[in-house]
Amino acid sequence: NFHGMPYQLLDPKLSEKLQKFPKKEFIFQADTLNTWIGESVDAPNTSVLLDNSHGAGVFSNNWKTFNKPYGYAGGLNIDTLPVAIDEWRTQNLGMKWIDMETGVRNNGEFSTAMVTEILEYLTTEGYIYSGKKRN
């Protein structure tokens, strides 16, 4: 994750170099950088993470789309996720993944119960395919 990497440090041949590692995905976080960074790196194994809270875990509904795989972070949890999903559907954003690090913690500790609750919700909403036939 190239979070907070000053654009001056980016190698002009970065796209070429990243393609040498096709089994790895490189994520460019677009919170502290200009959003162009994730889009300008032209390698198939790159994606963009948009976190308007700059890693502070604060929910925002200021969504943006990108011309490559992308995901969202920032205050997502079991309470805010349905609101976010409704917005993504309404705006037809088609995001690919979410980052919920703080949203699955209870008093700073990772909670498998919270993860399970979120996965069950996402499966019910059709965002995760469980292997079972859907009606």
Predicted regions and their residues:
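Glycine-rich phosphate-binding active-site loops on the catalytic face of alpha/beta enzymes
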Residues: N1-P6, N52-F59, Y72-A73, N77-I78, ...
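Conserved, mostly hydrophobic/aromatic
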Residues: A84
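Conserved anion-binding
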Residues: N1-G71, N77-T80
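A generic structural motif
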Residues: I27-L33, D51-S53, I98-R105, K132-N135
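Structural alpha-beta junctions
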Residues: E16-I27, A43-N45, K68, T90-K96, ...
